[in-house]
């Protein structure tokens, strides 16, 4: 079956796909407010979204194809300390994939490591007034055959609760500096596809929520999850 996207792009299935087998080793360690994770994947017959030419014409044909194998290595460290009214969460992630394309006429960039940096800040100004400043930066990444350029994002939010924390009103602004862009290049067999655009994630808004389960009673429950729901 072939799906028509536009005059230059088709999509289709592949009846000759074989199942992939994933072998994984993962390690986790937690100490107080510090968390560490590292792992390794070895994937036999990985299914990869590939662009080729359709019947030798100037038309890109996208479908899944089995490659020989792929190896992934990754690690992350997360720190969530508490300093009274200030609660930060810092995260650093490392990942790198090695897709073996032997036997395929595909000229892709060399594999390179990818780093993701995240810093979420929570400020408990008063018991009912909280501010949030979330920042993220991700370096360039080669995922299978798609190279993605770096991007960054900054979000802010302010919340105020009323009526013994039953009512909460919040205002927020996402992607303050308009830096969360979608920019990538996909390498295929005699084809290269690129995209460089902004997804219009920059916005401001307001939220209003009301919790109907703040009172303790044997019928309504204890509201044990309310604090966690407000945090999220």
Language-model segments: what does each one mean?
Residues 33-38, 85-90, 127-133, 164-169, ...:
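Repeated loop/turn-to-beta-strand initiation elements of outer-membrane beta-barrel proteins
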Residues 1-3, 7-10, 42, 46-55, ...:
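Outer-membrane beta-barrel translocator domains and adjoining extracellular loop/strand segments
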Residues 1-44, 60-73, 199-202:
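Outer-membrane beta-barrel signature, preferentially recognizing the C-terminal barrel domain
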Residues 42, 61, 66-138:
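Gram-negative outer-membrane beta-barrel transporters
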Residues 162-232:
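C-terminal beta-signal and adjacent terminal beta-strands/loops
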Residues 34, 41-45, 84, 95-99, ...:
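Structural signature of outer-membrane beta-barrel domains
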Residues 17, 25-31, 75-83, 94, ...:
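Residues on the lipid-exposed face of transmembrane beta-strands in outer-membrane beta-barrel proteins
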Residues 94-99, 115-162, 174-177, 186, ...:
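C-terminal beta-barrel architecture of Gram-negative outer-membrane proteins
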């Amino acid at each position: 079956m072939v799906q028509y996207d536009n005059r230059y792009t088709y999509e289709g299935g592949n009846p000759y796909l074989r199942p992939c087998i994933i072998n994984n080793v993962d390690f986790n360690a937690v100490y107080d407010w510090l968390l560490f994770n590292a792992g390794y994947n070895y994937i036999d017959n990985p299914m990869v979204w590939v662009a080729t030419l359709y019947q030798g014409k100037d038309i890109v044909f996208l479908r899944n194809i089995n490659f020989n194998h792929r190896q992934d290595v990754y690690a992350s460290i997360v720190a969530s300390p508490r300093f009274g009214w200030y609660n930060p969460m810092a995260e650093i992630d490392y990942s790198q994939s090695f897709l073996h394309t032997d036997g395929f006429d595909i000229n892709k960039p060399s594999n390179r490591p990818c780093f993701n940096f995240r810093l979420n800040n929570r400020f408990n100004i008063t018991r009912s007034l909280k501010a949030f400043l979330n920042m993220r930066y991700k370096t360039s990444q080669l995922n299978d055959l798609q190279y993605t350029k770096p991007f960054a994002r900054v979000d802010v939010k302010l919340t105020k609760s009323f009526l013994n924390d039953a009512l909460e009103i919040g205002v927020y602004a996402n992607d303050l500096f308009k830096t969360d862009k979608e920019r990538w290049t996909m390498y295929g067999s005699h084809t290269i596809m690129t995209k460089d655009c902004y997804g219009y994630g920059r916005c401001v808004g307001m939220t209003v929520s009301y919790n109907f389960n703040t009172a303790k009673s044997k019928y309504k429950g204890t509201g044990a999850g309310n604090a966690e729901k407000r945090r999220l």
